[in-house]
């Protein structure tokens, strides 16, 4: 019996873990740029292994990059992101996020914030607001204050016995928001970075150009069980 149990354990299949870190030394290999704006040029560049993504003043530019693969599932996602100083009221977001569709999306979006957001986060004059959002199933958003500069953003999708996720948003190694969500590894995500002039993160159209920087993006996850985009 002992030998049988040992053999059974040895033959049990291991869960496939996929792991990668993009440091952008090879440009945006594995990614593609897309936008929702009127810019005539692509607003990104890579210099010395740092990915820069930009928007223009007095526009509602939305500059984004996404992974080519869409099968990322439960596990840990990390972004090393530089948040620039943002002028009071300017509507701009520096984003680090996961996306399947408009109902399956988990975000970090960092901007100056509206007066209401800044009050909720108790943001000081030299701070910006990091909005942590699950777009649906259920919808939830929370705001915390951080200073401009380099930060480590992390989203963890932890599997529960009921087949659903607990999602955890962490900043610089500290968990800042936790949510039980109503879907699980059947949903395959793409990974995104972005700088977007979004109205919800300020009070006025941006009066300045903005650039967010990404030193690296990494993950250690399992593949989703179903990855067809809906």
Where are the model-predicted features located?
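Secretory/extracellular carbohydrate-interaction modules
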Residues: 53-125
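Extracellular glycan-recognition surfaces and repeat-rich motifs
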Residues: 28-52
């Amino acid at each position: 019996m002992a030998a049988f149990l040992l053999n059974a354990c040895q033959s049990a299949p291991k869960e496939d873990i996929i792991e990668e870190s993009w440091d952008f030394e090879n440009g945006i290999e594995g990614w593609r740029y897309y936008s929702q704006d009127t810019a005539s040029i692509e607003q990104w560049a890579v210099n010395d292994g740092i990915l820069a993504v930009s928007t223009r003043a007095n526009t509602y530019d939305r500059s984004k990059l996404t992974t080519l693969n869409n099968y990322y599932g439960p596990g840990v996602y990390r972004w090393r992101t530089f948040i620039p100083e943002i002028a009071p009221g300017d509507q701009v977001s520096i984003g680090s996020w996961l996306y399947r569709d408009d109902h399956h999306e988990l975000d970090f979006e960092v901007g100056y914030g509206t007066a209401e957001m800044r009050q909720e986060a108790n943001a000081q004059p030299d701070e910006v607001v990091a909005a942590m959002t699950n777009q649906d199933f259920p919808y939830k958003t929370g705001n915390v204050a951080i200073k401009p500069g380099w930060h480590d953003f992390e989203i963890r999708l932890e599997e529960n016995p009921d087949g659903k996720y607990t999602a955890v948003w962490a900043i610089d190694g500290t968990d800042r928001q936790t949510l039980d969500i109503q879907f699980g590894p059947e949903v395959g995500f793409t990974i995104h970075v972005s700088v977007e002039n979004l109205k919800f993160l300020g009070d006025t159209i941006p009066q300045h150009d903005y650039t967010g920087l990404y030193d690296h993006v990494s993950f250690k996850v399992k593949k989703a069980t179903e990855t067809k985009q809906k």
